[in-house]
Each structure stands twice: as C-alpha cells, then as structure tokens.
Amino acid sequence: MQRLLELKKYAEDYIKEKSKFFDLKLSDGKIVVIPLKSLEEFKKEGEIMHHCVFSNEYFKKKDSLILSARIGSKRIETVEVNLKSFQIVQSRAVCNGTSEYHDRIIRLVEKNMSLIKKLTA
C-alpha cells in the first residue's frame, strides 16, 4: 500500500514537472522521438525494451527528460537528455544495446536540442 502511494505521488510530480514537454515530437520523416508521459509509459518502455528505465526510477530524475524513439509503433531506442547541460546522457535499444538507427536518433535529438531548451524556460 505504501509503495502504491509513493508511485502515485511520483506520477503526480512527474506530470507537474514534465508536462511542458508532452507535446514535443521530433521527426526526420521516418523516426519519431516523443517524451514518456506517465509512469505507465515508463513501465511499458522498460518491459518492451528490456532495460531499467522504470525499475531504476528514471521518472524521479528531475534533470532528465526521457524520450522514446520509434518507427511507427515499434520502439527503437530510449533516450535520456540532461535538462541542465542539454546533452544526451544515453540512448539505448533493446537490452541496453544500440540499434541500426542509433546515430540517426542522436543527430535528430541534438538537432532539436534548442527546442527542448526553449521548453524548459
């Protein structure tokens, strides 16, 4: 019960802190990069991608924005952006690997970092 109450609070805090990014959508025509918008999305991302984005509670990191890079409905990589330095901390595919689109995803996010920066103001 205590854990559920904690998660509810984290969910509310996450929405309060990160909702300004929820309309963000970066695309190069094939790849689309969007923010994770809820703890449920973090959980699903972690399960599908077989990595620790949910279990290590990245939703609690105030200075991180977690993005999901996709082609259609298929998740390709999960991207962590530092909201203080506006640098990509990591971008991981299934099982913490890299995808064939890794460099393209990095370029897409870096190219649009000014947009992310503008949303933090």
What is the meaning of each model-derived region?
Residues 1-121:
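Catalytic-core elements of nucleic-acid end-processing and repair enzymes
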